[in-house]
Design a protein with these regions (language model features):
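Glycine-rich phosphate/pyrophosphate-binding loops
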Residues: 116-125
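Glycine/threonine-rich flexible loop motifs
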Residues: 97-106
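Short beta-strand segments
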Residues: 6, 32-34, 91-94, 124-125
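Nucleotide-activated donor-dependent transferases that construct or modify glycoconjugates
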Residues: 1-9
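Short glycine-rich anion-binding loops that position phosphate/pyrophosphate groups of nucleotides
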Residues: 9, 37, 71-72, 94-97
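A cross-family phosphate/adenosyl-ligand binding-site feature
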Residues: 3, 14-85
Length: 125
């Protein structure tokens, strides 16, 4: 199984490292995450400037990782495009709580929704 891991708290968040490590037990993992915090971005996508991605300076043991100058939804779209087949997108582990009205603008949840829009299963935590 090919698992794409992302978040809205950035490539430097301890939550994404923990999620990527746990996901390794279930398949091949790739991390594609924002280069800076993108909390509360909702389903936003970048349309007014070029997107770039670079190998991550953060080391994820046994996992290929990239940072992106975009939103969580951008990361999912780019990550699934770069990887011919993606079976599952995991988004998180979020630093804060995604409860109640916060769900409407959660970048963490939006990444999982973006996966579904692209025909891939998505889970947010």
């Amino acid at each position: 199984m090919r698992i794409l891991v992302t978040n809205d708290d950035s490539i430097y968040s301890p939550g994404i490292a923990a999620l990527a490590k746990a996901a390794r037990d279930f398949g091949e993992v790739r991390v594609v995450a924002p280069d800076v915090e993108q909390s509360s971005m909702g389903q936003a996508i970048t349309a007014t400037r070029p997107l770039w991605y670079k190998k991550s300076p953060v080391h994820f043991e046994g996992v290929e990782a990239y940072k992106v100058n975009g939103t969580p939804s951008d990361c999912v779209a780019l990550g699934t495009h770069l990887w011919a087949t993606t079976d599952l997108v995991l988004s998180g582990i979020n630093v804060g709580y995604n409860l109640g009205n916060a769900l409407w603008h959660s970048g963490t949840l939006a990444a999982a929704k973006q996966a579904v829009l692209l025909g891939v299963r998505g889970i947010a935590r």
